[in-house]
Amino acid sequence: VXLSFAGTSYPIVGIVRFESAFDQPTSIAGSQIEHYPIEMSVGSGGVCSARDCATVDIHPRTFGNNVFVGVICSSAKWTSGRVLGTIATTQVIREYQVLQPLK
C-alpha cells in the first residue's frame, strides 16, 4: 500500500478485526476492536509505504458472530494526497505442521 501525505505527517497503519452478531453493524465500541500494527517506511516527499504481513484469526470467538477485518490509516495531520495500492488477503483453509524425528 502506498500513501502520500502533505507535510511531516506520519500515519499509523494497521489491520483491524472485530466481531458482531449483525450482518452490517452500524456502530462498533472501541473495546471490541483488535488492532494489528503494520510496519511503515517513509520515503522522500512524504510518501509512505507499508509492506508487512499479519495473521488474523477469522474464526469467531463467540458462536454465531460474524468476523470483520479491514485496514485503517490514521494520522495527526490528516491532509492526504492519493491513496494507491493493493491489499492482498489470503485465507488459509488448513495449516500443516511437519515434525521431523530427532536424530
Swiss-Prot record:
Protein keywords: Capsid protein, Host-virus interaction, Viral attachment to host cell, Virion, Virus entry into host cell
Major localization listed first in the record, in broad terms: virion
Superkingdom of origin: Viruses
Subcellular localization, as worded in the UniProt entry: Virion
InterPro entries: Capsid/spike_ssDNA_virus (IPR016184), Spike_G (IPR003515), Viral_coat (IPR029053)
Biological process terms in GO annotation: symbiont entry into host cell; symbiont-mediated perturbation of host process; virion attachment to host cell
Keyword tRNA processing tagged: no
This protein's GO CC annotations: viral capsid
Keyword Nucleotide-binding: no
Function description: Major spike component. Involved in the attachment to the bacterial host. Involved in the determination of the phage host-range.
Family from the record: Belongs to the microvirus G protein family.
Subunit text: The virion is composed of 60 copies each of the F, G, and J proteins, and 12 copies of the H protein. There are 12 spikes which are each composed of 5 G and one H proteins.
Protein name: Major spike protein
Source species of the chain: Escherichia phage St-1
